[in-house]
A protein has these predicted regions:
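Alpha-helical transmembrane segments of multi-pass small-molecule/ion transporters
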Residues: 1-314
Length: 314
C-alpha cells in the first residue's frame, strides 16, 4: 500500500471521528463533569429521559419516517438473530473462564446488550441521517423490550418468574410511543399541531440527554477487578459482534440505510442499562460497570472504522 493511500485512509477515519463521534463524546464529557463536580444524580436525569423524552423521540421518528411493515419486521428479525448470536458466542467464550452463576449471568448480559439508545441513536443520526435514525430507532425499540424481558431473565438467573418479566414490558415508555405512532399511521390521523409541537420539542431534547446520561454513568466507573473476564467481554462486544452483524444483515436482506443502522447498532458498546440490572439482581455489578466503561472508551477505534466501511459498502 502506498504512503498516500495510508494518509488518505487516516484522514478519512479522522474526518469520521470528528464529524460523527466527537460530538457525542463532547456532550458525554459534559455529563461526566456535571456528575463529578456538582453531584447531579444520574437516576433523576435518566428517568426524565426514559419516561418523557424517549417515547417522544420514538413517536416523532416513526411518524415522520418512510418505514413500512416489511422493513420494520426485517429490523426486528435482525435484532433477534444478532442477540441470539451474541448469546451463543458469549456462552462459548465463558467456558474456559469457569464462571460461577452470578458471574456467568453478568457476562452474558454485557455481551448481548448493546448501547443502542444513549450512544447508537445519536451516532446513527450523525453518520446516516434521518433515514438511518428511523431504522436505528426500530432496533432501539426491540432492544428496550429485550432489556425488560430477556435481560431481566438473564440477570435474575431464575429468581424471577416469566410473568414478572412480561409485565416489565409495560414499564417501557418507548413502547407506548411506538404504539401511538402506529395508530396514527394506521388511521392516517396526524396529531394536531398543538400536540405535535411539544412532542417534537421533547424529541429534539432526547438524544442530547441520552448522551449526558452516558457521560454521567462513565463517571461512576471503577478499575476492573477481573481483567481477563472484562477483556473477553469487550472484545466480543465491539470487535466480534460487528463481524457477526454484517453477516446476519446480509442474511436477513437489510440494504441501504437499514443495513448501515442495523450493523452500527449491533456493534455499539455495552448498554448502560446493564449496570442497573446488575445492581438490582447483584450479579457482579463492578464487572458490569467496568465493561460498560471500557467498551465505551475503546469504541471510537472500532466504530470509526465501521462507519467508514458502511458508508462505502451500502
Amino acid at each position: 500500500m502506498m504512503l498516500s493511500d495510508v494518509t488518505d485512509a487516516a484522514q478519512l477515519l479522522l474526518s469520521i471521528f470528528i464529524s460523527d463521534l466527537l460530538p457525542v463524546f463532547a456532550i458525554a464529557g459534559a455529563g461526566f463533569i456535571l456528575a463529578r463536580t456538582i453531584g447531579v444524580q444520574v437516576q433523576t436525569v435518566s428517568r426524565v429521559t426514559f419516561y418523557a423524552l424517549a417515547p417522544a423521540l420514538v413517536f416523532n421518528v416513526l411518524v415522520s419516517s418512510t418505514l413500512d411493515g416489511i422493513q420494520a419486521g426485517r429490523m426486528v428479525l435482525f435484532y433477534a438473530l444478532v442477540t441470539l448470536a451474541a448469546f451463543l458466542m458469549a456462552r462459548l467464550a465463558a467456558i474456559p473462564l469457569r464462571l460461577d452463576r452470578p458471574s456467568l449471568s453478568a457476562f452474558l448480559l454485557v455481551v448481548v446488550s448493546s448501547n443502542s439508545g444513549n450512544y447508537g441513536l445519536p451516532v446513527a443520526l450523525l453518520a446516516f441521517g434521518r433515514d438511518g435514525l428511523a431504522f436505528a430507532s426500530m432496533y432501539f425499540l426491540a432492544s428496550s423490550l429485550f432489556s425488560y424481558t430477556g435481560g431481566i431473565l438473564i440477570a435474575a438467573t431464575g429468581r424471577r418468574t416469566i410473568r414478572e418479566a412480561i409485565v416489565g414490558i409495560a414499564r417501557v415508555p418507548a413502547v407506548y410511543g411506538a404504539a401511538a405512532a402506529g395508530l396514527s399511521l394506521l388511521l392516517h390521523r396526524p396529531l394536531p399541531a398543538a400536540l405535535m409541537r411539544p412532542v417534537t420539542m421533547l424529541s429534539d431534547a432526547a438524544l442530547p440527554m441520552m448522551i449526558i446520561v452516558l457521560g454521567m454513568q462513565l463517571e461512576r466507573a471503577t478499575r476492573p477487578d477481573r481483567p481477563a473476564m472484562v477483556a473477553t467481554a469487550v472484545v466480543l462486544s465491539i470487535v466480534l459482534m460487528p463481524l457477526a452483524a454484517i453477516g446476519i444483515a446480509g442474511l436477513v436482506g437489510l440494504q441501504g440505510a437499514a443495513f448501515q443502522a442495523g450493523v452500527l447498532q449491533a456493534s455499539m458498546p455495552t448498554a448502560v442499562m446493564t449496570t442497573i440490572l446488575a445492581l438490582e439482581f447483584d450479579v457482579a455489578p463492578n464487572f458490569v460497570t467496568s465493561v460498560v466503561a471500557l467498551s465505551t472508551l475503546l469504541s471510537p477505534l472500532t466504530v470509526t472504522v465501521l462507519i467508514a466501511f458502511l458508508q462505502r459498502h451500502s
